[in-house]
Structure formats: C-alpha cells, structure tokens
Swiss-Prot record:
Its main location: periplasm. Part of the rseD-rpoE-rseA-rseB-rseC operon. Belongs to the RseB family. One of its GO terms (biological process) is negative regulation of DNA-templated transcription. It comes from the Bacteria. GO terms for molecular function: antisigma factor binding; identical protein binding; lipid binding. It comes from Escherichia coli (strain K12). Homodimer. Interacts with RseA with 1:1 stoichiometry. Binding to LPS stabilizes a homotetramer that does not bind RseA. The lineage of its organism: Bacteria, Pseudomonadati, Pseudomonadota, Gammaproteobacteria, Enterobacterales. This is Sigma-E factor regulatory protein RseB. Binding to RseA is inhibited by LPS fragments; phosphorylated N-acetylglucosamine (GlcNAc) with N-linked acyl chains are minimally necessary to disrupt binding to RseA. Once RseB is no longer bound to RseA the latter is susceptible to DegS degradation. Thus if periplasmic LPS levels increase the sigma-E regulon is induced. InterPro entries: MucB/RseB_C (IPR033436), MucB/RseB_C_sf (IPR038484), MucB/RseB_N (IPR033434), MucB_RseB (IPR005588). The N-terminal domain (residues 24-203) is responsible for oligomerization, while the C-terminal domain (residues 222-318) interacts with RseA. CDD domains: RseB. One of its GO terms (cellular component) is outer membrane-bounded periplasmic space.
Length: 318
C-alpha cells in the first residue's frame, strides 16, 4: 500500500508543477458544468475509492425520474452494502444493522463532496487552475486544481471528461501535496435507458425516516476570533454527553461550501489533555484552557485546527 500511495503522489506532484498551469474563470465554469452534469444526467460509474485504510470497489447509478433524483451506490466486493436516494431521502442498507432513512440532497458516502459543490460560492476564496489534459478511463479529461488562496485547507485535483463533464478522477491532497484520498472511475456509461433499469428502486418500499434529535438552542459564552476565509456558521446546538454523565457540550458547525468542521466546547475534567489526531481527511484537535476542553473536528489540516482552537475567546453570552 505504501508503494501505491508513493506512486500516486509522484503522479500528482508532476501535475502540481506544470509550467502551463494557470487560474482562469473558464476553469471555474467547467467545474460548475461538472456539478450540473452529475445531478442532471442519467449515468452509471464503476469506480474505486482509495484512502489510507484501503481500497473499495463500488458502482454508482444516477437518473432523473419525474424530475426527482434517483440514485444507488453499491459496494461490489464483500458483504452487500447499499445506499439508495429517492428525492431528498437517503436510505442505508448494511449487514447487521436495521435499515434506516435520512433526509439529504445527495449520497456522500465514497463520492467526493466536491462533485456537488457550488463553485460560484467558492470563487472568492479558491483558485481554479487549469493544468492541461490527459486520459482517464480511456476518456480525454480536463485537469483542474482547486486550491484555497489562504493556504489553510486541503486541495483537490479533478480530472473531468471533456464530453459528458462527469468526474473521472478526484484526488484530495494535503498541504504537502500528499494524496489523502482518491476517487477513480474504471468504467462508465451515459445513457437514458439507465432510468428504465432503476424503475424497481423508484417503486421499492424504503425504511422509515430516522428522527434525528435536535439540540437545544442556546447562546454560548465563547466565539472563534479567527476562521479560514470563506467559512461561516451553519448551525449551533447544546447537547448532553451520555458518556460523561450527561455533561453539556456546545457545538458550532462551520462550512465554506467545500470543507466543514465543528467547534465543540465542554467543561474540562481532571482527565482532559491536549491531543491531536488525523485520520485521512479528518482531524480531531483537543486543547484545554480556561477550565474548558475545546475540540475541533473536521476536514482541516492539523495546523489550521490548532489555530482555530487557540483563537477561541471566552466572554459574554452570544
């Protein structure tokens, strides 16, 4: 596995230093076309998802039926794991677990969230850099880097089919250019008949909608005084921690439209210590000060998570 990741990093690195790379509005427009194609076309993708934990082989089918999205993600190897989208409901089927349904706009499991991003929203804070063209899955592809201007986030490289505008490969890179995750299409098909083959899903009985508990709305006595450019608060809540005698934890969720993270604050305990853990794209950074335990969880480099925690200000409720 180490050799595989080293080889991928070399290939990605050669793209990063292309002499012809340039940031252009046209690259952002192409990415916006990818967003539209991914949600409007009838198509099927067979792909592999690679990260530090291993390699998965999957199939994704998408169609528009009665002006509603219908999609299926299926794990091709091992126990059958399936995710089905019908309209704004996402149903999960996994061995050993009771099937359940959640509300959602699209399937996120094993698919790069970049595909569904509104690139117009990102344009003030990100550069979209054209790197050239190459072939993936026997298709000619545009290659585009997506890089935050302030250097505080991970970056992406996208290989997009020049005809269908569907993504053929997406690499997530850390700030040193190392590949953290890769989505790579092996075979694909764009065909109106795919909607016909998915008619059974359109009529299938799906599991009941799972009720997600809503956290208590409250004003907090803390706020972050520094965030990476473009991030804004999406939601906030206060919930008890069952594993810590129902101690309340206060949380704020932030997103820039591509990456997200949460800031979580609870009362420090005698066992509270500073910790830093990164697994793939996800960082968990815990720091203790002012009798509080501050934990940053999300899709951020460890240095950025640490800086956010250091800039939490305690004071009057807000």
């Amino acid at each position: 596995m180490k050799q595989l990741w080293f080889a991928m990093s070399l290939v990605t690195g050669s793209l990063l230093f292309s002499a012809n790379a340039s940031a252009t509005p046209a690259s952002g427009a192409l990415l916006q076309q990818m967003n539209l194609a991914s949600q409007s076309l009838n198509y099927e993708l067979s792909f592999i998802s690679i990260n530090k934990q291993g390699v998965e082989s999957l199939r994704y089918r998408h169609a528009r039926l009665d002006n509603r999205p219908l999609a299926q993600l299926l794990q091709m190897d091992g126990p059958r794991r399936e995710v089905v989208q019908r309209g704004n409901e996402i149903s999960y089927f996994e061995p050993g677990l009771e099937p359940f349904t959640l509300n959602g706009d699209y399937i996120v499991d094993s698919l790069p969230s970049l595909i569904y991003t509104d690139f117009k929203r990102l344009s003030p804070y990100y550069d979209f850099i054209s790197v050239g063209r190459t072939r993936i899955a026997d298709r000619l592809c545009e290659v585009i880097r997506v890089v935050a201007r302030d250097g505080t986030r991970y970056s992406y490289i996208v290989w997009m089919d020049t005809e269908s505008k569907l993504p053929m490969r997406v690499d997530l890179l850390d700030r040193d250019g190392e590949t953290l995750e890769q989505f790579r299409v092996i075979a694909f098909n764009v065909n109106q008949d795919i909607s016909s083959s998915m008619q059974t899903l359109a009529k299938a009985n799906l599991p009941p909608l799972l009720s997600v508990p809503v956290g208590e709305k409250a004003k907090f006595s803390w706020t972050p005084t520094w965030l990476p450019q473009g991030f804004s608060e999406v939601s906030s809540s206060r919930r008890p921690l069952p594993t810590m005698d129902n101690m309340p934890i206060e949380s704020r969720l932030y997103s820039d439209g591509l990456f997200s993270f949460s800031v979580n604050v609870n009362r420090a305990t005698p066992s509270s210590t500073d910790q830093m853990l990164r697994t793939g794209r996800r960082t968990v950074s815990t720091s203790v000060r002012d009798n509080a335990e501050i934990t940053i969880v999300g899709e951020l480099p460890p240095q950025t998570a640490k800086r956010i925690a250091e800039n939490i200000k305690f004071g009057a409720a807000q």
